[in-house]
UniProtKB/Swiss-Prot annotation:
One of its GO terms (cellular component) is cytoplasm. PANTHER family: L-FUCOSE ISOMERASE. The keyword Manganese applies. Mn(2+) binds at E333, D357, H520. InterPro entries: Fuc/Ara_isomerase_C (IPR004216), Fuc_iso_dom3_sf (IPR038393), Fuc_isomerase_C (IPR015888), Fucose_iso_dom1_sf (IPR038391), Fucose_iso_N1 (IPR012888), Fucose_isomerase (IPR005763), Fucose_isomerase_dom2_sf (IPR038392), Fucose_isomerase_N/cen_sf (IPR009015). GO terms for biological process: D-arabinose catabolic process; L-fucose catabolic process. The gene is fucI. The lineage of its organism: Bacteria, Pseudomonadati, Pseudomonadota, Gammaproteobacteria, Vibrionales. This is L-fucose isomerase. GO terms for molecular function: arabinose isomerase activity; L-fucose isomerase activity; manganese ion binding. The active site is at E333 (proton acceptor), D357 (proton acceptor). Belongs to the L-fucose isomerase family. It catalyses: L-fucose = L-fuculose. Pathway: Carbohydrate degradation; L-fucose degradation; L-lactaldehyde and glycerone phosphate from L-fucose: step 1/3.
Amino acid sequence: MSNLVKIGIRPTIDGRRLGVRESLEEQTMNMAKNLANFIAENVRHVSGDAVECVIADSTIGGVAEAAACADKFKRENVGLSITVTPCWCYGTETIDMDPHMPKAIWGFNGTERPGAVYLAAAMAGHSQVGLPAFSIYGEEVQDKDDTSIPSDVQEKILRFCRAGLTVATIRGKSYLSMGSVSMGIAGSIVDQPFFQHYLGMRNEYVDMTEIKRRLDREIFDKEEFELAMAWTKEHCHEGKDYNREPMSEARKQEDWQTVVKMTMIMRDLMEGNPKLAEMGFGEEALGHNAVVGGFQGQRHWTDHLPNGDFSEAILNSSFDWNGIREPFVIATENDSLNGVNMLFGKMLTGQAQVFCDVRTYWSADSVERVSGYRPESGFIHLVNSGSAALDGCGEAKLTSGESAIKPHWQMSAQDAEACLSATKWPPADVEYFRGGGFSSNFLTHGGMPFTMHRINIIKGIGPVLQIAEGHSITLPQEVHETLNERTNPTWPTTWFVPRLNDEGAFKDVYSVMANWGANHCVITYGHVGADLITLASMLRIPVAMHNVEESDVFRPHTWSAFGQDKEGQDYRACATFGPLYK
């Protein structure tokens, strides 16, 4: 990405001259510089690039300096701001008044000067003018010459930065619908007001005949196609053909060529390709400025042409024939809401995302009945034909040897090769996909932490978010095969157990499944529920269910004015302030 979003640091100060302000200048500006260094060392853009911080040219003692800072931030493409101070400052004269910029204030917990008093006064001002801000205040008192950033402050700063960068980076980008509504799936009825008002994004649309046109008229890079085909033949190994009448070799070779071309075409539709301009296709070379897209596929395409499973899976992975790269985000069946969750997960972590059907709840009794094996608890079968990134198999390893999905900038060629080797590509089940193609098939390693999440749109409320943190499990191979053969064995599988807390939707695994709001979900590697909650609060999307520890929930300070129950607070605050871009 060009012109990357920056993080603005606003050092505010007591404006009284002739001694007070002068005595605080160095400490206040050093606080800003230390914070900028900390962020630069610990936060990256989704592209893997380092984050740049922009500090105001001077400390901010009043409205004139606040305005000068705002002007600088506009010139520098600042997308979120953190105000820092060790002392009292003039509340509403010094706060960030940008209506769309996520904002936080870190008030130094020291006794010599009342940084906490300014923090409280500023939060009151933010609440009164209707611009929610995040309050950051360390639990332990620090000495005035202590330049360290306490661990609890660090955690909140990093969470705010990850979520705020997501908000600022997706603003102005596009969701690209390739096709329309798939099989009546609600998420593929693209809700333009949601994208516009909550995310600040626009919607772009192309009919699937545009992909067919580019196939027929060869509007793709032919040199890259030769490279891609050679790579695919070497690294993408065919799996078992479960069809009653196996596909012929000639048909399979034709399908391989088609799905590789489809992959290139979908990518070019999203982000453009200067090579197309060299070929005389200047309009096609521009793309649609899309950070997320969806492919309808079923059934108008897949009844006649090879399915999109290969294209979706490869694009969503962190590697292809061009090497390691940032994953794209493509939602199968054009489920735009699941696509948004995939985008959130990628933006927060830099990792490839796994799109899943929430397919089956298996109780311990049911597993024992059909396999003779009794697991420790019930679990959920997550499986989908299409856009599960190959990284989801867990073959990339941490230095400890544990299975993981890594940020793409940490992926190695060996990691990519391991994921490819663990994936088979069975010919598509023609009962589902009459036009042929191939589906990815892998099994996710057990013991991996995952966060399952999904946005749903509720009439009268708007978007709501669901979150379930948990982990993958490993079943004995024969048990896995017994259960997997009962559904479609050509698709990738993750056996998932959410973390329970004996309350509400998380009293047992069955209740998580029963309360899930749609047929699809995203699983993101790691326990990132707290980051998702912070992000949702910035966008004014309430959280319907989650199992994140209350101590990890970080929302704007003014949420505490909306009652005592945390989730009720969230709904009332989001309804009161409304979507970020209303």
